[in-house]
Amino acid sequence: MDFESKYCTSQVNGTITITTRKVLDENLKSLLDEGKGELFLSCIPRNHSCSPRWIVEVASELGEVYIMRYKIDFSGNSRGYAYLQYINVDLKESAMQYLPMRFRQLCMCLRVEPSTNNRELVLKNVESSLRPWQVYQEMLKIHPFTIVRVYEYQLDQFFYIFEYRNNDSAASAHQRVRNSIRKFGEHAHISWLTAENILSRASGSFCFQREVSQNRTRRVPPRQKGCFKF
């Protein structure tokens, strides 16, 4: 395979990215960029015996890879995991069977699982003097997001759930917000949204949805109460 003609390799901070050079239909590209068909590869050796290029070359035996994001530490060694997507999202199930077997044949015991594609962050303990609209604007300056839900769990006490386009975007936002967390108060904290449902704290609150593009606000149906939604 002529690797260089098919794939482009780049690095930003702790992520080595290998992306197809193929021009894709915009609708398909949008789905892929939102994490459709994403796989999570783990148990990658932390030395250089299992390079990002090698993984893509093996994965390409099944079909053309759209992107692989390979995580490294400050020394350039693998952090033990990576994310992989095929252009053909229907290959996801086949890949979970084929790739572990193929890696074992090549003496590499990598695990291949569906990616959770976690793309939501929770901002808590924000200074009470900051109103939701101010937090919205400050967060938008740090890193673009697709939507934010704002829950009032006590009078004038809010927590914020930010949704990003995909896991990679959320990870970048997480790091940038941590670096700027003092903007939101001495005790402010940003973390990943987990299965331990934080929304239970919001029962009995109220909810509005702001349509930012039209600069107007409308009340959300009762079943969605408990939040502001920008």
UniProtKB/Swiss-Prot annotation:
One of its GO terms (molecular function) is RNA binding. It is found in: Cytoplasm. GO terms for cellular component: cytoplasm; nucleus; ribonucleoprotein complex. It comes from the Eukaryota. RNA binding protein that forms a complex with bam and bgcn, involved in 3'UTR-dependent regulation of a subset of mRNAs. Preferentially binds a long isoform of mei-P26 transcripts. Involved in 3'UTR-dependent post-transcriptional repression of several 3'-RNA processing factors. Involved in promoting germline stem cell lineage differentiation and mitosis-to-meiosis transition. Required for proper transit amplification of spermatogonia. Signal peptide: none annotated. Residues 37-128 form the RRM domain. The RRM domain is required for binding mei-P26 mRNA 3'UTR. InterPro entries: RBD_domain_sf, RRM_dom. One of its GO terms (biological process) is male germline stem cell symmetric division. This is Protein tumorous testis. The lineage of its organism: Eukaryota, Metazoa, Ecdysozoa, Arthropoda, Hexapoda. Keywords: Cytoplasm, Differentiation, RNA-binding, Spermatogenesis. Disruption phenotype: Viable but males are sterile. Male germline cells are arrested at the transit amplifying stage and over-proliferate. Males display reduced copulation behavior. It comes from Drosophila melanogaster (Fruit fly). Part of a complex composed of at least tut, bam and bgcn; complex formation does not require RNA. Interacts with bam (via N-terminus); the interaction is direct. Interacts with bgcn; the interaction is indirect and is mediated by bam. As part of the bam-bgcn-tut complex associates with twin; may recruit the CCR4-NOT1 deadenylation complex to mRNA 3'UTRs to mediate post-transcriptional regulation of expression. Its main location: cytoplasm.
